Amino acid sequence: MAGVNKVIIVGNLGNDPEIRTMPNGEAVANISVATSESWIDKNTNERREVTEWHRIVFYRRQAEVAGEYLRKGSKVYVEGRLKTRKWQDQNGQDRYTTEIQGDVLQMLDSRNERQQTGGYAPQTAAPQYNAPTGSYGAQPSRPATKPAPQNEPPMDMGFEEDNIPF
């Protein structure tokens, strides 16, 4: 059985996208997205929060879109996969970094919010940008599955939602 390498991130940009052009002329965008988890500490009854930062890279048209429309604070939905790169530093030491290679980018802010942060979006709905099929080893998309019935009662999982640490 093949493995699964899929990441879904919903969060806010920590800074403006960094855009550069590769020698072949294709655009590359690097963004840093924050996700936060909060919960109530059982012992102190205080709200706790942990923020995680994610490095995400987009290529080609998605990189151009990120550079044009995204700004610090923009709320985004990203689908992608983890990739680890290796390079040598100035001292010849091997270095590694793991980042998310973005395949899907969707802006979640309203048009007014994007305009206030300096971005511009002529669309009326939040646009979604998918990486071209077959690029960078992407698998072809599969047909959508039938959604689960919405009239079923929620399952009792044996715990209270307020006590979940995420």
Swiss-Prot record:
PROSITE patterns the UniProt entry points to: SSB
GO cellular component assignments: nucleoid
Instruction: List the keywords (alphabetical).
Output: DNA-binding
* Polar residues: bias regions: 125-138
Q: Which InterPro entries match?
A: NA-bd_OB-fold, Primosome_PriB/ssb, ssDNA-bd
**Alphabetized GO MF terms:** single-stranded DNA binding
Which intervals of the chain are annotated as region Disordered? 114-166
SSB domain: residues covered: 4-109
Q: Name one GO biological process term.
A: DNA replication
How the protein assembles, per its UniProt entry? Homotetramer.
Q: Which PANTHER family does the entry mention? A: SINGLE-STRANDED DNA-BINDING PROTEIN
Write the protein's name.
Single-stranded DNA-binding protein
> What species is given as this protein's source?
Pasteurella multocida (strain Pm70)
UniProt gene name: ssb
